[in-house]
UniProtKB/Swiss-Prot annotation:
A lipid is attached at residue 36 (S-palmitoyl cysteine). Residues 1-30 are cytoplasmic. This is Phospholamban. The lineage of its organism: Eukaryota, Metazoa, Chordata, Craniata, Vertebrata. The gene is PLN. One of its GO terms (molecular function) is ATPase inhibitor activity.
Length: 52
């Protein structure tokens, strides 16, 4: 059990030390922003439909 914990801990540490490429980070940010905008638009549409 300790070995598994140690392996997972070292894997997490290794994953966190890997530097993400700037392009990948930019893409993730853009995706997140787009997702937020779409969610807000859908919410507004739902509210308008309920009010009508």
């Amino acid at each position: 059990m300790d070995k598994v914990q140690y392996l997972t801990r070292s894997a997490i540490r290794r994953a966190s030390t890997i530097e993400m490429p700037q392009q990948a980070r930019q893409n993730l940010q853009n995706l997140f922003i787009n997702f937020c905008l779409i969610s807000i638009c859908l919410l507004l549409i739902c509210i308008i439909v309920m009010l009508l």
